[in-house]
């Protein structure tokens, strides 16, 4: 540890921002609504993902070992998502986010039907994993673009909201399971995803001019 401290060069943080940056960030509607979108979309994902294993076992009547294998597919889908993000995001950032959210919504909507066969479940989980992984990567990149002068503060807020979305998703999933049934978690997540999708589209169309002015 001592050698690391002595040998590594000093790399001061640039455009990190501080608490004083909060009023400035609060004046950027695209950024604020992106935070709202993040909370809702991540909640949508974890509404279903938190309960995916009992869903596959109790609703899909799948073998527990198979259910565990399905979860591993999420890890492999993350690799594919990283490659897709690196290749396509820079070409059309907004369209990339829209497509990623669409993948998430349709995956959740078709979750119940995918339990019919092993192939359909593996395929859907892989697509679902690509969708949510691309969402996480692209929304974080979007935050950096919208707050280039206070990146540390903006990303810290994003991380906090992301984690809040995880907790909220688990709560929504529990409520859906308790009052609607375990088989409804996909539909509940899809409904939340649709809300986040609509918010993202409408706020982007309404406030995109503020981003152009900000970067002049």
Regions found by a protein language model. Give the residues of each.
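C-terminal membrane-cytosol helix-exit motif in multi-pass small-molecule transporters
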Residues: 1-14, 199-203
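Extracytoplasmic gate region of multi-pass secondary transporters
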Residues: 29-72, 76, 93
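A late C-terminal transmembrane helix in Major Facilitator Superfamily
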Residues: 145-184, 188-192
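Residue-level signature of mid-helix packing/kink "hotspots" within the transmembrane helices
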Residues: 75-83, 166-167
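Juxtamembrane helix-start elements in MFS-like secondary transporters
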Residues: 62-71, 117, 121, 151-155
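C-terminal transmembrane helical hairpin of 12-TM major facilitator-type secondary transporters
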Residues: 94-139
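Intrinsic disorder in cytosolic terminal tails and internal cytosolic loops
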Residues: 145, 202-216
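Helix-to-loop junctions at the C-terminal end of transmembrane segments
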Residues: 80-93, 177
